[in-house]
Amino acid sequence: MGRLVGKVCIVTGAASGIGAETVRRFKEEGASVVGVDLHDRSQGVDLALACDVADEDAVRGMFEAVRAEYDSIDVLFNNAGISPPEDASVLETETAVWDRVQDVNVKSVFFCCKYGIPHLLETGGGSVINTASFVAVMGAATSQIAYTASKGAVLSLSRELGVEFARRGVRVNALCPGPVSTPLLNELFARDPEKAARRLVHLPMGRFAEAVEIANAALFLASDESSYITASTFLVDGGLSGAYTTPVTAE
């Protein structure tokens, strides 16, 4: 039997990258999946909804639409996020870029938790997975200051909620991927190959993660197999955060 049979799972940012792979893995494990994206173009889902997750009223309406279709909500994967190329050093990044990144990367998680967690509580609990990043626990000279700050906020928010709701049946964890081979990252690094090379050299495994590897971690956190895990910084970074120097060869 699949690990998510009988569970209703909401995935934001479901149309591409980690979100799309997570939709596929959740479906393979028996979940009913609601795919949420800026446009209703999520593939392979049971219900596709268009929602600007940085808009509070839109998020509230999204959850109402889900409950109109399903009796419960069991898993929230708050995964939507942006990393615009204009986001760079604090000396260069415009305030408008900062604000846009915080709106999409932080406010969206706040809104989805604010309006989603009550539905989990109503039916006895569930799992909330918020996509943070390895940059929430490490610094980088190749700065993306708005993105880094936003993911630090998601990490702190997740830890707080994980503790707050621990005895009410709702687990909340921050999923912290390392660099992932997604359209978003590939587009960013195509514009700046030097930035890509400077990051790749620090990865002990010598490669970026594949989106399905992050999706598998989300699947674990969504399932009852992770029933004693909450308020965690769940790193899936190929050893990056634990490395000082990296192997020269595969010997």
Residue ranges and their predicted role:
Residues 118, 163-167, 227:
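Alpha-helical segment proximal to the catalytic Tyr-Lys
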